[in-house]
Amino acid sequence: MSDVDDTIVDSIAIVGAILIGIFLIVVSVSNTSLFNNTEYDSMINSVLVIISSVIAYTLGKRRSKS
């Protein structure tokens, strides 16, 4: 039962990270004035690195169990 719970949690983490990334991209595209703000660009880059880390960690954890 623990494997099923881990799979559900991992799936939620990956889907959530992807949705947050998509939301940030949509906000950036719809509001072009944000592209001129270097602080916002730095924040977006940091958040995308965190999202990538979550996905990589989750997929790596699943791979090491197999």
Swiss-Prot record:
Cytoplasmic side: 1-6, 61-66
Subcellular location field: Host membrane
GO CC aspect terms: host cell membrane; membrane
Membrane topology: Multi-pass membrane protein
Extracellular face residues: 28-39
Sorted UniProt keywords: Host membrane, Membrane, Transmembrane, Transmembrane helix
Membrane-spanning segments: 7-27, 40-60
Protein name: Putative transmembrane protein ORF66
